[in-house]
A protein has these predicted regions:
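Pro/Thr/Ser/Gly-rich low-complexity, intrinsically disordered linker/stalk tracts
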Residues: 22-65, 115-159, 213-228
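Solvent-exposed loop/turn segments flanking beta-strands in beta-repeat/beta-sandwich domains
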Residues: 52-80, 151-178
Length: 363
């Protein structure tokens, strides 16, 4: 009995040893029915890199000698397509793709069209509908058209931005081009050197790199809007001062275009982020600051509670300079408001405000 058990253990050990020492071939072999089923060696190390309206597929081929072709297949919810490539090919660029996530399948084929096990991966190309493309900096954050001048405020020079330039029609009718750069975009406000025909479009063109995109992206041209826009704090000031009956501003915040274009004197009694809204007023001659705020001497000297402030003096000083050049604007400043403004000849200190005399009648 012991001899039989010993023989059985030796036999099992020998079988196990044979199984363990058998090679696990890349061409996979199985037994089924009366014979061996031979699987074709599949591709490995499948990766995909997104590009502009394309996906770049890379893989490692199997050394199986019976491989004749490599099949690359791509599909989304709408379309399916594929291509057969010569043995040894290790990369393929799938072009003309839409804004969609694609399933990429790579497999090996022998001369009879028998196919290996598949290797699958998913990826999405960059297109004009991609959220990273849509949110990419347009460089020009806000623009104003004053007479024949384009005045720009910038959002900065985003990482990845390669080029940005404007195309427009000059005042004399010829075509104009102006290249923006990081130095210009770092300025708080900038006046285009060329005078332009403001009735014609001004388009912004950009190229750049985004995220993992392998290609230089040429973004769709963007037309600068000529619709006047006002800052939120200036609109709040107008609502407080004039109400929202629509003559100057309505309840939704739309400022009357005719009011802004024809205004010659603006009385401003409020803290404000910047004076950029004045660029929407091509006929403004006088900016009167603090005239309607009555303070004691102590109140006027109180920097915290008694003095209106401009929180962005860099933009505001440049705006006043531009307006003075174009409309002859003069600033009349009462008490000690807007001390952040520069010491310019067109900024006149008017001293303290005085309560108006009121005639009283006995009834």
């Amino acid at each position: 009995m012991k001899k039989n058990i010993k023989t059985l253990i030796i036999s099992l050990a020998a079988i196990t040893s044979l199984t363990a020492c058998q090679d696990i071939k890349d061409t996979y072999a199985d037994m089924a029915g009366d014979g061996e089923i031979r699987y074709i060696g599949k591709c490995d190390n499948l990766t995909v890199s997104p590009g502009w309206e394309r996906l770049i597929v890379n893989w490692t081929n199997n050394s199986d000698p019976i491989i004749e072709k490599v099949k690359v297949k791509w599909t989304n919810d709408i379309d399916t397509d594929s291509v057969l490539l010569d043995r040894g090919t290790t990369t393929y660029s799938i072009g003309n793709l839409n804004n969609s996530t694609y399933e990429i399948i790579v497999s090996s084929l022998d001369k009879d069209g028998n196919e290996s096990l598949e290797n699958t991966i998913y990826s999405r190309p960059y297109t004009s509908q991609h959220e990273e493309v849509i949110s990419f900096s347009r460089v020009v954050a806000k623009q104003y058209f004053l007479d024949n001048n384009l005045i720009m405020l910038f959002s900065g020079w985003q990482n990845g931005l390669e080029t940005a330039y404007l195309k427009y029609t000059k005042k004399d009718g010829s075509e104009g081009n102006f290249e923006l750069n990081e130095n210009i975009a770092s300025q708080p406000i900038y006046v285009l050197p060329d005078e332009i025909d403001t009735s014609k479009p001004v388009n912004l063109y950009r190229t750049g790199h985004i995220g993992s995109c392998k290609d230089l992206i040429e973004f769709d041209p963007y037309e600068l809007s000529k619709e006047p826009s006002f800052t939120s704090d200036f609109k709040e000031f107008l609502k407080t001062k004039y109400g929202t009956d629509g003559k100057i501003i309505n309840s939704t915040g739309n400022v009357s275009d005719s009011w802004a274009k024809n205004l010659q004197t603006l009385e401003l009694d409020a803290d404000i982020n910047s004076l950029e809204d004045l660029l929407n007023m091509p006929n403004l001659k006088r900016l009167v600051v603090g005239k309607n705020t009555y303070l004691t001497e102590a109140g006027a000297n109180d920097e915290t509670r008694g003095q209106y402030k401009v929180f962005d003096p860099a933009i505001s000083n440049k705006v006043l300079e531009i307006m003075h050049q174009h409309t002859g604007l003069v600033v009349e400043r009462y008490n000690k408001h807007y001390q952040e403004l520069g010491k310019e000849s067109y900024i006149k200190d008017m001293g303290a405000t005085h309560l108006p005399e009121i005639d009283c009648y006995d009834i």
